[in-house]
């Protein structure tokens, strides 16, 4: 059962990372293609010159940026929960592979202006520290 859990945790983290990476990148890229930031026509409203296209684009980017922030926070929450569960169950995750997948996701997000790699560093530092502490405590109990 435990071996199955280890494989399942690794497969879940890897697959959810890949799904988020592909879908978020595609959606943001397509959204920006549909609503490009092009300054074209300006009009005069009262005594103030306003660029309606620019105002609309600012609104559109607020929408996509809010959605992007929501999705990234959701992904980071899922990642933290699964890493915490692997500590709780004393799982042996192939950490280098998990980190590679997650940082590749971060690299993809940096291409659309949402670099999450600094948050990933904090998450994995916390995970490694907790995992190390658990292993030290376990060894102390075993040999004390």
Q: Model-derived features: where do they sit?
A:
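Long alpha-helical rod scaffolds of large eukaryotic non-enzymatic complex subunits
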Residues: 1-144
